[in-house]
């Protein structure tokens, strides 16, 4: 893979070249609207399979596994669903959807996938699967073949249709991770983290000694907001049997589906097992043009507390044109096993920065249709107030 660097995330320029050369191919063809600054959206195909369980096809093609019988001679596939006119995927059930896109990757290019922001904020668990692969959300270098998406709606029953994009694919070559020493230099020169409690017309970056770096930037949780009484600092998903049609924007009343969480006097929050929460970061983050980033869970401290679904940040995230720099990170949180008490300012997750192979043609923001470019604590685009 040629370029100005030997290691990096492929930009929209490279992605369009791969699409033109049919290394990323689909029927109907991949559109320009699917191409983001550092990723490409992947679309649902024409049918879904309702499965009895999740699986990984480590030593076989996925199409072969769909005919395997379990201990009681039941097929992995319970039934098929036609998605061409839209269909319902029920919460708590496992589905597998062949995607419209397939890839023929160069030998030095591999891929990784993540849910789109709206997918994560709806508590829809998705994972990319490929043939002969022992891992989720990863495509090995040189892979040639179809792509499949495992879908498990957790909080809400959803309606989907052929052509809808629930996840995105990022392609990379070499070792693009930014070292800790480079991250510190980058924060001093480009300012990666900003305080969130300042004047909205101003931006104050974190002092260098306050930036915690260890294979990425550590960020904290915000349970205080501006400190006023009755301020909303999060949301918890309600038990709701209504169907959320993912093709509708600004359609559903937020209070029918979400319970606001108000700031407590001691700035803490008790997370209950198997409840789903939307929270926000204490800091505002920026991703400079020559970099991309990915949010990862702070696993060492939280174990089974899942702190995100959607994790990609495109070049230009949080940059903006106004005086207020940086953007809060919205977190999707689902505790497991036991109640978990968190407090304002607690270290909660980590963002890993990676080099771009070259600068993208376009940066993240409203000009490319980004729904959350000026987000604070924000629900998915399907809800209204």
Predicted regions and their residues:
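DUTPase catalytic domain/fold
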Residues: 1-385
